[in-house]
Amino acid sequence: MGPPLLPKHVTAVIKCQKDPMKALEMFNSMRKEVGFKHTLSTYRSVIEKLGYYGKFEAMEEVLVDMRENVGNHMLEGVYVGAMKNYGRKGKVQEAVNVFERMDFYDCEPTVFSYNAIMSVLVDSGYFDQAHKVYMRMRDRGITPDVYSFTIRMKSFCKTSRPHAALRLLNNMSSQGCEMNVVAYCTVVGGFYEENFKAEGYELFGKMLASGVSLCLSTFNKLLRVLCKKGDVKECEKLLDKVIKRGVLPNLFTYNLFIQGLCQRGELDGAVRMVGCLIEQGPKPDVITYNNLIYGLCKNSKFQEAEVYLGKMVNEGLEPDSYTYNTLIAGYCKGGMVQLAERIVGDAVFNGFVPDQFTYRSLIDGLCHEGETNRALALFNEALGKGIKPNVILYNTLIKGLSNQGMILEAAQLANEMSEKGLIPEVQTFNILVNGLCKMGCVSDADGLVKVMISKGYFPDIFTFNILIHGYSTQLKMENALEILDVMLDNGVDPDVYTYNSLLNGLCKTSKFEDVMETYKTMVEKGCAPNLFTFNILLESLCRYRKLDEALGLLEEMKNKSVNPDAVTFGTLIDGFCKNGDLDGAYTLFRKMEEAYKVSSSTPTYNIIIHAFTEKLNVTMAEKLFQEMVDRCLGPDGYTYRLMVDGFCKTGNVNLGYKFLLEMMENGFIPSLTTLGRVINCLCVEDRVYEAAGIIHRMVQKGLVPEAVNTICDVDKKEVAAPKLVLEDLLKKSCITYYAYELLFDGLRDKRLRKKKGFTVVAI
């Protein structure tokens, strides 16, 4: 028989055991050992093990047993550990209960217990309650230590009061506490969080000058704050100071830098840093490569990310699920599902087991490519491999089906989800509601929302916004306003998207007074208008020729720091043009770039060119057209049509004909009306050759009636096609009968083909 097990042996075994329930089983089995009695150390080890893994019910049972067998005055450390474990799992009330029961069990809390519960409260956002605990500690005559002050400083920083934290830091010495690196870095981090860079940098320098011993792990926490904000330059400044103090960065430090560089999109810097680590050390680890691969994928550099996956393997590192899933998700989001599937195949060969995230990425990618059948097959494959789909995976597939108009299949999938014991979220219903609205079935979507409410799901703002947008798009404003009333009655505040949908619908169906009244309500409710809001209002005001009010609204945009865009000015310029104020429109057209720094676009030029051609000022229209070309703003089909029509109306057939040919050369298809207008003008001047050339060019471009395509014989088709085109133009009233007669004879006269004028003139 071997020597008996001592409590220290049992404690060591429990600490090494990874399974908390096996640790408890071993702990309980020792009760049967003759002469063995659990001590504070064995109780503490099993309680910490159970608490760490969240087995709180079992932990509480052991606590009860411990109180009966160990003196309560010795248990403060155990209670502190229990509070911390409850706090880590977000069970704040349970942590508070442990603290409050300490007195009851004759274990008087010291500063350590107060610090523990204050830390739990601050980390969970219960700042007022933490302050009350602190005041209670002071009332009981317990002197706070450096950790107490640090926790309070952390509370101040988390509530955006870094200057209050600094005052507390400066007062620590008068309270008998020596400032340490954690206290300093807490306040420095608070300053950086609130973008007080100068104060943060100054305090950091003061800390180094004070001779405080610098701990690299604490410094890394400070760097994490800055890297999260993407402020890598400030990190470099602090690191330079630290290196001069003889403290060298470790791999964790470099990983933070790489993460920060990737977050800012400075991928070249991140790649260079990884290269330096490979060559000079410390050698990159899985986290290093994961940070870089994530950054590259985020910036759509998927193939480069895959290169680093290969380098990672070559360095002897084993990619984890995060590595593979990041690259797979990147390829899928980039519309390269085939490459993602190849990565999956390679990863599986190397021992990777696809999880919910993998299947979600692939299914989402397939749905975006319209491959819904393959997405469904992949979903079923996942089920067959034992993957238990969660709500997110179901929602991904439901959304994909809905976007492809497969609402019935999406609804069946939602029902299947419920049958399998998964509770649909409001988002699940929102996907279906959105899908129905996109198909124009807004009343059906409204009915689904009523079903949703009957099942105990309350719509959120997104649900209401979908319905309001759907009804507003269909110009059913009474229904849209009814939804708004339901929304308000249930305490859901409309947002800018809600009001924009309503304003857009009202703009098209109601008087501008109703539009402006809704806008007034929006502002009174504290909802800030955005650019889209103002563009809708301008459209309404211009429609009713309220141009002074429209200009006033432009000034209001400036006061509200909302920058106008090309649509804003396009709406205003169009309003002035339709009101006959061409000078005002042109002044505004020039002002948009000079005063508002808004670049003109092709649609904006089209508006002003249209106005000048309507007034038969083709000289100005041609000048603006040339300006467009010089600025590399490509004219579109509408621009050419305006120029052709304008010159034909003013009798300048040569330029009208020139712009028509240029239009067709640039790949734009003129309307039959535009073609007919030029043909008529040419025929009036007896220029049958050019007019016939246009007909033949129409045949070459495939601008022919359907009857032409029924002629199989090539020779007959060549002869018949121009005549059929001509008859089609006459039938659709695009050419005059005079032009028809001239061209009918001209197209038959083979001698015309030999004349030089018949050839289409090159521009």
UniProtKB/Swiss-Prot annotation:
PPR repeats lie at residues 39-69, 75-109, 110-144, 145-179, 180-214, 215-249, 250-284, 285-319, 320-354, 355-389, 390-424, 425-459, 460-494, 495-529, 530-564, 565-595, 601-635, 636-670, 671-705. Disulfide bonds: none annotated. The keyword Repeat applies. It comes from the Eukaryota. InterPro entries: Pentatricopeptide_rpt, TPR-like_helical_dom_sf. The keyword Transit peptide does not apply. Keywords: Repeat. Belongs to the PPR family. P subfamily. NCBIfam families: PPR. This is Putative pentatricopeptide repeat-containing protein At1g74580. It comes from Arabidopsis thaliana (Mouse-ear cress).
